[in-house]
Amino acid sequence: MKKSLILITLSLLLISCNRSQNNIEQYSIETLMSNNRSSGGYFSKDANKLIYSSDKSGIFNIYEVDLKTNEEIQLTDSKEESFFSRGYSPTTGEVIYSADIGGNENSHIYIIRDGKSIDLTPGKNTKASFFGWTNDELEMYVISNYRDPRFFDLYKIDIITLNSEMVFKNDSGYNLNSISNNDNYLVLSLNLSRSEQKLFLYDVRSNQQVEISDKAANFSGQNFDKNDENYFYTTNYDSEFYYLMSYNL
């Protein structure tokens, strides 16, 4: 009796497996290769709209979705360069995106104003990236090597006038990690080797910096708390694994 039950159970399992295999939908290589890629979904400040990048046109362009009507419009119509959305201006609602020129990998930051794209980080050899917004949301942070191709400085751009101002001059090859919510502190990192990475806290107001990494180990910056009272980072000092630490400002 037991043997019969076992045989019946095995038979049912085999039938179930065969059915599952038969129900697997097959796709051609042409279908798989024709799938669209999308990235960078960003909401407007009032959460009524969403922008994202997609290569559904054959190359990455910017698309906007009205979340009330589900209607979608294509904001850019590039035929050569890929355009990647970076968000809306929280003040003006204008679209910010990045793109290189001819695939040279030197990305610039653009704003769409009155239907036209304006390059906020011009320069033939300039490479720039979006770094967020100031606390009052009136200025945009941008990292750029415009001054010196070897180093990336921090700038802020007035979103109304589009004038730029240098916040941090980087002559030592620091990596720029994050800036505090109140715009007063900038966290920098410096890679010395695979086993040692230093971490620094730079005071934007006084132009002074202190080292957070007081030991020879890997220190990796994370973020500030909401009130900018502490900065969180991870380290593997005297440990096989990374653990979370905080630095009181």
Residue spans for each PLM region:
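Short loop/turn segments that connect beta-strands within beta-propeller blades
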Residues: 66-70, 112-116, 158-162, 203-207, ...
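Conserved beta-propeller blade repeats
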Residues: 35-53, 80-98, 109, 124-143, ...
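Preference for long, solvent-exposed alpha-helical segments and helix-linker "stalks"
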Residues: 103, 117, 125, 149-150
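Short flexible coil/turn linkers enriched for glycine and charged/polar residues
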Residues: 103, 148-149, 161, 193, ...
